[in-house]
Amino acid sequence: MTTAAERKYINIRKRLDQLGYRQTLSVDSLPLVEKLFSDLVHTTESLRQCRLSSGKAEKESANLDFVLEPYKLENTRLNKENNELYLELMKLRECSDKHIKDLKTTLKKCSRETADLKFLNNQYVHKVKVLEKESKAKDEKIQQLQEKNLRAVVQTPGGRKRNIAFRRQRMQIDEPAPPSEVSAYPVPQPEDPYIADLLQVADNRIQELQEEVQQLQEKLAQMEKGVLDYSKQIELREREIQRLSLALDGGCSPDVLSLETRNKTNEKLIAHLNVQVDFLQQANKELEKHIQELMETKETVTTEVVNLSNRNEKLCQELTEIDQLAQRLERHKEQVLETADKELGEAKKEIKRNLCEMRNLEEKMSKLQWELDLSHKEKERLNSELLLKSDLETVVHQLEQEKQRLSKKLQSFAVTERELTLEVERMRLEHGIKRRDKSPSRLDTFLKGIEEERDYYKKELEKLQHLIQRRSCAINYSAREKPPVVKCSEKGDCSTDVHLITRERDELQRMLERFEKYMEDIQSNVKLLTAERDKLNVLYKEAKEELSTLRKESTNSTSPNHLVSCVEKEKERALSELRRITAEKEALREKLKNIQERNAVGKSDLEKTIEHLTYINHQLENEKYELQSKMLMMKETVESLENKSKLQAQKLSHVTGDSSHQKTEMTSLRIVSEQLQRSLDDCQHRLSIKRGELESAQEQIKMLEQKLENLSHRMTVQSEETHAMKKTIGVMDKEKDFLQETVDEKTEKIANLQESLLSKEKVIAQLKVTVAEYETSLNQLQETLTTRDREINSLRRQLDASHKELDDVGKSREISFKENRRLQDDLATMARENQEISLELEAAVQEKEEMKSRVHKYITEVSRWESLMAAKEKENKDLLDRFQMLHSRAEDWEVKAQQAEGENSSVRLELLSIDTERRHLRERVDLLEKEIQEHINAHHAYESQISSMAKAMSQLEEELRRHESEKATMLGDVSSLRELCIKLDSGKDVMTQQLNSKSLELERAVAELENVKSESELLKKQLTNERQTIKNLESLLATNRDKEFQSHLTSHEKDTEIQLLKEKLNLSESKLTTQSRETSMLRTKVTQLQTDYDNLKRQMSNEKYERERAIQEMRRLGLPTSPLSSTLKSPVQTPDHINA
């Protein structure tokens, strides 16, 4: 009890001295001080835990701020998206309003144009009615002149004039009628109040249009002023935006974004107003063109009337010539018809003959085709049988290879068994083997399996021999039946050849079925062989395991000689059975060779049959050389067969791949066996090493016994070393605290870095999503651009067509100008009006020149827009290239991020391992501290004991002679002291080893800390680089968004332009339809006039014919024909007179 209390006292005293409490301590107050000390330790630990928890709480609060940052960023992003959506909504509203306004303007234009067209239609209808009335009046007058009931005066030979009552009365005109004073017949005024004078209406319309043009010019000036004001305001806003962007370098607030969006909307409004101004200018130009076209249509109508009158005269002359030609043609037609009837009769006879010949030829062709189809089918079957034969040969070859492989395997098994016997003999010589009940049973099972394999191979050989005998019989049968086939072919009877071919076909089909069965048997045999191979592998593994267990047992224990003799006998039996199996295997090989020779014979027979069939096929082809054109169908079948052969080659490659897989498995098994042999060699080497270690340990024991004697001298040195150890332990404690603080800081930093990495991963994921969205939007824009380009190309084509039509109209316009000049010469009365019209025409020409200049400007603008489009296409290409670069960079960054994630995971794992090692170290340090304190206490106790013993020894030296009985007790004490010294020496060695291990661990920890510091610095650098790259990416994304926004604006402007062009096209199409309707109306009128003209011509021809008859009758009667000639001349002049 006293020793325990003294130990407690010493321990508490030392701890108090370490903590700085140097006050005196009584023995009575020991338990109280112990409790107080334990409470102090508990409070310090609780303080540490509180500090750790407070630090963790602070970290969590910092983490909360860090976690809230992405939410804040998302909130700002959502605000931006909301603003953008609002802007898009405003844009859509503006677009809808503009579209409604454009539709209203188009409606107004259409209503005006319809009113104008109605007006023109009414005028044209009125003109047509007037012309119809004039034509009717002229027709009536002509009829009156022709059919007046005047008496014909006939001049007799005596010079008298006599009235003829019974002849038709003819009008005698001595002189032409005097020209009428009135230039034209009075035209009744139209009853329709909507019809008015065209010139007055045109003048009024021109004045109205001029007023509208002036109003539009005033509006244009106002709009230009407004545009200038807007441009100034935009410049001021841009300056303010630049100032605000300089003020807000860190980030953009939603107010700034709203200002930017407002500026962009203002710019869009200005662009839209410019587009509207251009549209109004174009509308003015179109109105002016429409006025010119109306004037031109007016002139063309007048010219057409004159042209029709001239054509009527020409047609009268042409009709007489046509009548003569018609008579000639009728005569020629009658002759041609007669000859054609004769030729038709002959052709019908020839056609009947050809039809009969064609039917006969078709019947022959059908027969030949049927025979050819049969021959082709038989050829295809023979080809398929050849392919099956080749497949069988490949399978036989594979089986030979597998048999060779199995023979090699058996040889390897024999070699391994020999090695096993050698090892067993060696083990028997060294230690002896202890027999168990399991090994002979496994060997029996192995031998039984080998016997079953032998029986199985024998059965398969018998099956193969049976199949080959059947095939040889079938071949011999076919060979016997060949000579009559040849005789039949020599005779040339096709029917006998067909029967023989059908028989051979049936035989080949049977052979095919047999071969298929044989193939199925071979496949099943292959499956069974693979299963048996797996079983052999399992048995081989089990044998290896048994060998390993036997080796272990041989190392652990020794076996008697009779067990070894039994094992050797069993081994000899197994070897004899293996030899017997190898002999059987060689017999099987010889049988396989015989089978292969028989296969070769069968192959030669089949080749002969194939040659005979090819000879028959050649004969058929020589007989039917006319149908060579239809042999192209055979090529398709050959191609299909080639495809089948390719598929079968692929199957063969798969089979070879399986065989290579089996070879790899065998190589792996060999490698495993080699590894097991190496492991056995390593175990033997280790055994020899351990024996040497045992000898060295015995030598060390002897050395330690010598060292124990020197320990008494080293005790003094050890006391000094313990003091140094205390100092070093205190320094180590300080370093340990410092390291713990640094580790805590590093863990905090690592946690922060992990959180930052998580946030960056989220940002990267968002960027990926945005990049994908941009990709989809770019694809959509490209599709829209392609569609727009197509529409523009179609519109350009339409414009080219309209330009061509305008050129045609210009040509017609020149013709109409020429006709107008003729009309001006004819119409002297309209000179004043023509002068006024010429002045107006000059003004219109000036306006036309102005319009041409405007058109040139418009063309220059179009070229400029085309250049802008090309530049924008280049920009789009650059954007695509940049996008690809960004995509590649993003992929690189993804790879880097994945690498960083892997590094982070490795760092986390390292940190976890460091934490675990640190905990282990702490536990070891605590244990070592406890042990050190115990050893120190023991050392102090020993020191006190040694001091007391020294005193006692001095006393005993003085009292040695007196107290010989106390010597024995002192010797016992010395022996106990020696034991304690031995224990102390051993403890010292352990302590030195532990100190060395601790020093090594500290060095490792310092190196790891340095590595961690370097890695953290690298991570910081990477983080800074990633931040810079993210900023660059954000700037690039912002620029891309701006460019996409600009491209969207341009596309919107292009859409508006395309809509305007479409509207223009619709207007032009509507005008074309109206013009086509007018032309159709005019054509109908022209047809009516032509019909009237034909009627007049007929009447004239009838009159001419009657006059000629009258002249002939007068000549017969002997009357003079001069008055009749005058009468003939007069009606020729009458139409001119009437036209005048």
UniProtKB/Swiss-Prot annotation:
Localization per record: Cytoplasm, Cytoskeleton, Microtubule organizing center, Centrosome, Centriole
Any Gene Ontology biological process: centriole replication
Residues covered by region (Homodimerization): 11-64
This protein's name: Centrosomal protein of 135 kDa
Region (Disordered), start-end ranges: 1117-1140
UniProt gene name: Cep135
Quaternary structure annotation from Swiss-Prot or TrEMBL: Homodimer. Interacts with CEP250. Interacts with DCTN2.
Bias (Low complexity) ranges: 1117-1131
